[in-house]
Amino acid sequence: MASVSATMISTSFMPRKPAVTSLKPIPNVGEALFGLKSANGGKVTCMASYKVKLITPDGPIEFDCPDNVYILDQAEEAGHDLPYSCRAGSCSSCAGKIAGGAVDQTDGNFLDDDQLEEGWVLTCVAYPQSDVTIETHKEAELVG
């Protein structure tokens, strides 16, 4: 007779608890508390928020701006009036000059490569990529 010297145990039939992938089950906790946003399906993504300082003719203003919101839109949301026209990066009404920091303005098409290198920015199509300082109301200087 043959003897069995080892016994194998399979655990594939044992149920596993799914990993937590959403903050929804936690009561009274919003995604904004953690700098997170939740898309449909419960997937959680991380978004950064940066300090934006705008130097206007009326004095400096500061606010926080998420990296997926245009600077002009967030400034208006914070109650500040800035010049604009097209809101599509196709004109120079919202032109400014970057004094420090970085933005992503790949959605715009008005500024050429030389102007971008010189620090010109269109706030209507600029996402902050770091804490940033921008001198606003510069359309006349840009086109003049």
Curated annotation (Swiss-Prot):
Cofactor note: Binds 1 [2Fe-2S] cluster.
Modified residues (Phosphothreonine): T136
Domain of life: Eukaryota
Alphabetical keyword list: 2Fe-2S, Chloroplast, Electron transport, Iron, Iron-sulfur, Metal-binding, Phosphoprotein, Plastid, Transit peptide, Transport
Compartments in which it is found: Plastid, Chloroplast
Domain (2Fe-2S ferredoxin-type): residue spans on this chain: 50-140
Main location, first listed in the record: plastid
Interval spanned by the transit peptide: 1-47
Residues binding [2Fe-2S] cluster, per UniProt: C86, C91, C94, C124
Pfam families: Fer2
GO molecular-function term, one example from the UniProt record: electron transfer activity
One GO CC term, this protein: chloroplast
Protein's GO biological process: electron transport chain; ferredoxin metabolic process
Chain segments annotated as transmembrane: none
Cofactor: [2Fe-2S] cluster
Role according to the record: Ferredoxins are iron-sulfur proteins that transfer electrons in a wide variety of metabolic reactions. Delays the harpin-mediated hypersensitive response.
Family affiliation: Belongs to the 2Fe2S plant-type ferredoxin family.
Protein name stated in the entry: Ferredoxin, chloroplastic
Organism this protein belongs to: Capsicum annuum (Capsicum pepper)
